[in-house]
């Protein structure tokens, strides 16, 4: 039967190895590597401006983004589905008040936020689904350790452009964690030069019977707020101006304008605040691995050290000259 000291040493070795392994896998359980959480709640982003305009008439304007996490999803990637609607007033149940509606579906890298393939875009218009190359993150930015989130400029996807636009770091606010704010400004852009859509152009006729083609033009100035530990979008503040212009870019007709910010930003931020940062996760990993290694070394020393009682019995058993 093994002596108790050997048994204890073997247990220490096992415990030490277990702690080292736990240290290696801890970041995945702590989400401290900046991955997109899969159990997010409160993922509806609603912006409402009671002083907006639609086709030149003053009216309330609501934009709503609803994000859903779907399968397939694993440690490396996640599937996202985002509904983006724009409507008059604050009740989206009335179809007649709908200005536009679209649904985006794509697969995303959980760490970097980068799309892994083209997005599938469906709209309420009588058009087949389109495939759009996103070419940049939207609802999640990379965090420190993958790519520096605090870069002065990042390319963030804009669904109205169907392309990325530069977003410049505007600040970092410490309110129950750190929220990074990026400013994204879109200069007046003729959307017909970006993609085909039913309302991107229109024909008008003047009093003399002359026809002219107008082009839907888009301008925006928005602030995007991202929680720093996860890189997840927690809030939006934007001024959006959509209008029709002639070939020279001169404004001729208003379409939609609004200035609003999302509700519930603090709740989204609070839900993410308990997730450890990457530095905290690394600290936990290092401490657990070091403690495990020390315990394993102590156990090995005890296991390999000669047993005193066995050595003494052998010494007594040896014949004397």
Where are these regions (language model features)?
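Hydrophobic secretory-pathway targeting helix
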Residues: 1-40
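Hydrophobic alpha-helical segments that drive targeting, anchoring, or assembly
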Residues: 79-89, 99-106, 119, 123-124, ...
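Juxtamembrane interface at the cytosolic side of transmembrane helices
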Residues: 2-7, 276-321
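Membrane interfacial helix motifs at helix-loop boundaries and amphipathic/re-entrant anchors
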Residues: 30-39, 262-288
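Juxtamembrane non-transmembrane segments of integral membrane proteins
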Residues: 27-103
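Membrane-proximal low-complexity regions enriched in glycine and acidic/polar residues
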Residues: 140-237, 242-245
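Extended, hydrophilic extramembrane loops/domains of integral membrane proteins
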Residues: 226-272
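A cross-kingdom signal targeting lumenal/periplasmic-facing segments of multi-pass membrane
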Residues: 90-170
